[in-house]
A protein has these predicted regions:
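Adenine nucleotide-associated cytosolic modules
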Residues: 1-255
Length: 255
């Protein structure tokens, strides 16, 4: 049950005609795992904390470097040398002390994901390599929870919610084979800071929609954006009958 202080704090989003107290309480009861606290994970964590998600698990094995500060807004100059999950956790706690924050300060392995996802309601994939993306996809399928995935490089980005348990495709339906990890790497290809800011914020939005049963999440849809021209495409994603990860599921396909 929300307190008077919380009702005041979240009042602006509670004014929305289709976002009610039940939705806010669902956020408060939710646990979200964010993998990667860089350019995407930073704004996602900040906005989910501000929106009132009750418990967040922040996972990143990297440390903050000066080159990160151009776009990774959960870190400051004072955080250089700190683990990114630790740094982001301090930022989240400063924004909303009601949020229970836990950290994983090493790179997650697939073997430990099934245990780590116990009690988790949703995963935000803000990682930058195919092996962990594939591992998160398999783990979310096994746990029956949504995976909010985004990628950004240069001035381009994409966003989708992969949720086979709700009838949608999975990440491997879109990417059956691993590509070149350098294509996902800002350090190799460059990126403009607002690009990851927008994509990470949209990840938070999609997470809120899934958790609070609000609006229409991007399940079975892929949002593709070119920020150089501000061109946006919304593509339909189909489940692959030969998908190596979700072909065993018999859920109806979203149309």
């Amino acid at each position: 049950m929300l307190t008077d202080v919380q009702l005041q704090r979240y009042g602006r989003q509670l004014l929305l005609h289709d976002f009610d107290i039940a939705g806010q309480e669902a956020l408060q009861a939710a646990t979200v795992l964010i993998v990667g606290l860089g350019g995407l994970g930073s704004p996602a964590a900040i906005y989910l904390a501000a929106a009132g998600v009750g418990r967040m698990i922040l996972a990143d094995g990297d440390v903050v470097e000066s080159s990160n500060l151009q776009r990774q807004i959960s870190h400051t100059e004072a955080d250089i040398g700190l683990n990114k999950a630790t740094s982001a956790a301090a930022t989240v706690a400063a924004i909303n002390s009601d949020v229970q924050v836990e950290t994983i300060t090493h790179t997650l392995t697939e073997d430990e994901l099934s245990e780590r996802l116990q009690g988790v309601d949703l995963v935000v994939d803000a990682s930058d390599n195919y092996p962990i993306r594939f591992a998160l996809n398999r783990a979310c399928i096994a746990s029956g929870i949504p995976l909010v995935s985004a990628a950004a490089v240069r001035t381009e980005g994409q966003l989708a919610v992969f949720y086979p348990a709700a009838g949608g495709p999975c990440y491997r339906c879109l990417y059956p084979q691993a590509g070149d990890d350098t294509a996902l790497s800002c350090s190799e290809s460059g990126v403009l800071a607002p690009v990851v800011g927008v994509l990470g914020s949209l990840q938070a939005l999609e997470a809120i929609k899934c958790l609070a049963n609000f609006g229409e999440p991007l399940i079975g849809r892929l949002l593709v954006m070119d920020f150089r021209t501000v061109e946006v495409q919304r593509l339909v994603l189909a489940r692959r009958s030969d998908c190596p990860d979700c072909q065993h599921l018999s859920r109806p396909q979203i149309t």
